[in-house]
Amino acid sequence: MAIEKTLSILKPDAVKNNITGKINSYIESSGLKIIAQKMMLLTKKQAELFYEIHKDRPFFGELVEFMTSGSVIVQVLVGENAVSKYRQIMGATNPKQADKGTIRGDFADDISENRVHGSDSLENARKEIAFFFAECELV
């Protein structure tokens, strides 16, 4: 099994509702390790660049507005098959379809405020990690 890194973002709704510790517990209980973490307030420009892949989708403006509405916590997770493992822990994008025992299944109610973001591929994980972290921050 491959040791991988992936990006996690605890979105403004997770920070606002004070459930970041609970989410971190789900992450760590799965065997993934948090090797870098910082709280930040995304600028509109940062959010637009990060979610650029969605720029032509009807929800893009709402997504950017939401992601800049409060603090987020960006994290780098490491472990065996970290990308797919974290996606399993997060649960389905739509919380109504997410299994109980997943972050979204247990803590989210709405697809537009679904608590967390996780990289969807190893290639995107590398890009997303580099967007937020310098190599020297990954210890």
Curated annotation (Swiss-Prot):
Chief subcellular location: cytoplasm
Localization per Swiss-Prot or TrEMBL: Cytoplasm
Pfam short name (any one): NDK
Domain of life (superkingdom): Bacteria
Function as written in the Swiss-Prot or TrEMBL entry: Major role in the synthesis of nucleoside triphosphates other than ATP. The ATP gamma phosphate is transferred to the NDP beta phosphate via a ping-pong mechanism, using a phosphorylated active-site intermediate.
Entry-linked PANTHER family: NUCLEOSIDE DIPHOSPHATE KINASE, NUCLEOSIDE DIPHOSPHATE KINASE DDB_G0292928-RELATED
Protein name from the UniProt record: Nucleoside diphosphate kinase
